[in-house]
Swiss-Prot record:
Changing D77 to N/A: Complete loss of activity. Abolishes Mg(2+) binding. Retains ability to bind ADP-ribose. Does not affect recruitment to DNA lesion regions following DNA damage. Strongly reduced ability to hydrolyze proteins ADP-ribosylated on serine. Gene3D superfamilies: ADP-ribosylation/Crystallin J1. Binds 2 magnesium ions per subunit. The gene is ADPRS. Mg(2+) 1 binds at T76, D77, D78, D316. This is ADP-ribosylhydrolase ARH3. Changing S148A: Complete loss of activity. Abolished recruitment to DNA lesion regions following DNA damage. Abolished ability to hydrolyze proteins ADP-ribosylated on serine.
Length: 363
């Protein structure tokens, strides 16, 4: 993509790097992706026409100007965990693994019917045990000591990128926050990649090539450690699986036309972090430019959500990750009020974003 086109796409009132608009847009985009995407979760294939009908139902009713939407779309464990993470950061004004782990577990105990996976429920139950002294141990014990490589650490991580402005801190605390539930490097490296994508989006990068180059540089370093190499090898995967998928994203973006089936075949749409985080990044980058199948009335953030959901599979999580990146990039101006007001918890989400900006953003 030409640098000028991407720079123009980033305009849209997002303002300066790490602006309040970007913070609000990030969490609003994540909430939208979860709420809208959950309607299609676990559908192997999703008809684009159906998605377009679904999102058009969120638009204001003609003939009733000024009418507000009411909350109709419920959030899942994706948003529940993302909110608990942010609430911990705000309560401690820093990353605190014990507080965050307890908030995750208490959130599950309070409201268990949000679509949590069986594996993470086991972790939460152990964390709720007063005898638990090491909050990382329950996750390490999963899957015969190999840990989980699911996308649960990545789906909730955006708050880390909002709270910390340095790449080093983003990587460090994304890893630690993910390791509370996902001890495999293939799980926590996915969370780091997602956090880095949000981090870069908050800066307003100037080209997709540069965006990918920066992500690739970070991930090649991270995936070069012995544990990452071992974990990939044990699954029969290529070394540096995230790096290889970032390269594949570049190849797909260079092609004039790519079908949804090709995207799913090359990048995935599953619950594994390596089958969903790169996919979310691709959705964000691809949808900076118009899509002939998506009406031009939809802006870039809306297009990102629509396209990511149309890939099927783990739609709520891929869309919440793509929405977080796009929202951080475009800012609050591209979040449609009627869509936002259709989502459960939208007001609290916005308050959390504003609080994060007030507490963590240095003027």
């Amino acid at each position: 993509m030409a640098a000028a086109a991407m720079a123009a796409a980033a305009g849209g009132g997002a303002g300066a790097a790490r602006s309040l608009s970007r913070f609000r847009g990030c969490l609003a985009g994540a909430l939208l992706g979860d709420c809208v995407g959950s309607f299609y979760e676990a559908h192997d294939t999703v008809d684009l026409t159906s998605v377009l009908r679904h999102v058009q139902s969120l638009e204001p009713d003609p003939g009733t100007p000024g009418s507000e939407r009411t909350e109709a779309l419920y959030y899942t464990d994706d948003t529940a965990m993302a909110r608990a993470l942010v609430q911990s950061l705000l309560a401690k004004e820093a990353f605190d693994e014990v507080d965050m782990a307890h908030r995750f577990a208490q959130e599950y105990k309070k409201d268990p019917d949000r679509g949590y996976g069986a594996g993470v429920v086991t972790v939460f139950k152990k964390l709720l045990n007063p005898k638990c002294r090491d909050v990382f141990e329950p996750a390490r014990a999963q899957f015969n000591g190999k840990g989980s490589y699911g996308n649960g650490g990545a789906m909730r991580v955006a708050g880390i990128s909002l709270a910390y402005s340095s790449v080093q801190d983003v990587q460090k605390f994304a890893r630690l926050s993910a390791q509370l539930t996902h001890a495999s490097s293939l799980g926590y490296n996915g969370a780091i990649l997602q956090a880095l994508a949000v981090h870069l989006a908050l800066q307003g990068e100037s080209s997709s090539e540069h965006f990918l180059k920066q992500l690739l540089g970070h991930m090649e370093d991270l995936e070069g450690d012995a544990q990452s190499v071992l974990d990939a090898r044990e699954l029969g995967m290529e070394e540096r699986p995230y790096s290889s998928r970032l390269k594949k994203i570049g190849e797909l973006l260079d092609q004039a036309s790519v079908t949804r089936e090709e995207v799913v075949s090359e990048l995935g749409n599953g619950i594994a972090a390596f089958e969903s985080v790169p996919t979310a990044i691709y959705c964000f980058l691809r949808c900076m430019e118009p899509d002939p199948e998506i009406p031009s009335a939809f802006n870039s953030l809306q297009r990102t959500l629509i396209y990511s959901i149309s890939l099927g599979g783990d739609t709520d999580t891929i869309a919440t990750m793509a929405g977080a990146i796009a929202g951080a990039y475009y800012g609050m101006d591209q979040v449609p009020e009627s869509w936002q007001q259709s989502c459960e918890g939208y007001e609290e989400t916005d308050i959390l974003a504003q609080s994060l900006h007030r507490v963590f953003q240095k003027s």
